[in-house]
């Protein structure tokens, strides 16, 4: 199976207080993970309202899975653990019993219906009958799908799907082409959510309760405007620029 774990890691948050705990940490409303919409994008901010992480979040049963780049996942997991206090929550970085891969909209039709039904809407998820596998349609101008779940079942599903010669996808390329941001070590604590368009892709909810950094994010929304916005462009260079470099 192609390994996308060099681009994408996962933090598992479980326990009876998991939803309440996550709600106080992220820019989006975790209660949106309903039966109709089981996935969201969300930011995780410092007290200054600047992004420390950008998550794709999905859920299987009462377990929440926060996807982010592996270069920050362990540190973010440890930071989240600092705020658990007395909450009945367990946080696990890179759980051993899960796996995942990506396919695009041209190949999703090759997935046999008897394996798992296909979601019809962006950021909607469907579950296999035994709830061991989740299939989520990602957002963007072109649809991509994240197949995620129990590692043994994912391996079986992958072998069945790829017998039809489906080609795997690149997570970072998907984000770039669909104007979805990401936060890496080099870009942590540099940008407020609006600077990388989180408010434009539904990753910030201005009606939810408090979370770390909310005051700065809300003040920009209601009283001002962001000094920066994210755009897609291309340039020819002799070498790749460092992440977070200024463009002049």
Segment roles from a protein language model:
Residues 1-207, 211-248:
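Basic, glycine/lysine-rich polyanion-binding surfaces/domains
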């Amino acid at each position: 199976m192609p390994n996308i774990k060099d681009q994408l890691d996962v933090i598992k948050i479980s326990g009876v207080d998991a939803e309440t705990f996550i709600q106080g940490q992220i820019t989006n409303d975790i209660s949106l993970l309903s039966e109709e919409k089981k996935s969201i994008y969300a930011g995780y901010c410092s007290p200054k309202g600047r992004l420390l992480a950008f998550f794709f979040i999905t859920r299987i049963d009462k377990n929440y899975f926060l996807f982010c780049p592996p270069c920050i996942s362990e540190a973010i997991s440890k930071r989240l653990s600092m705020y658990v206090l007395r909450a009945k929550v367990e946080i696990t970085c890179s759980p051993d019993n899960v796996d995942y891969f990506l396919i695009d909209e041209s190949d999703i039709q090759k997935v046999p219906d008897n394996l798992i039904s296909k979601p019809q809407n962006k950021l909607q998820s469907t579950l296999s009958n035994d709830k061991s596998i989740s299939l989520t349609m990602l957002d963007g101008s072109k649809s991509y799908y994240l197949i995620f779940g129990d590692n043994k079942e994912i391996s079986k599903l992958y072998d069945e799907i790829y017998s039809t010669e489906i080609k795997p996808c690149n997570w970072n390329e998907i984000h770039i082409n669909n104007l979805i941001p990401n936060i890496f070590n080099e870009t942590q604590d540099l940008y407020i959510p609006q600077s990388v368009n989180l408010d434009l892709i539904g990753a910030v909810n201005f009606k939810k309760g408090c979370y770390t950094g909310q005051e700065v994010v809300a003040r920009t929304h209601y009283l001002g405007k962001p000094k920066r916005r994210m755009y897609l462009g291309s340039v020819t260079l002799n070498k790749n620029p460092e992440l977070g470099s200024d463009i002049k």
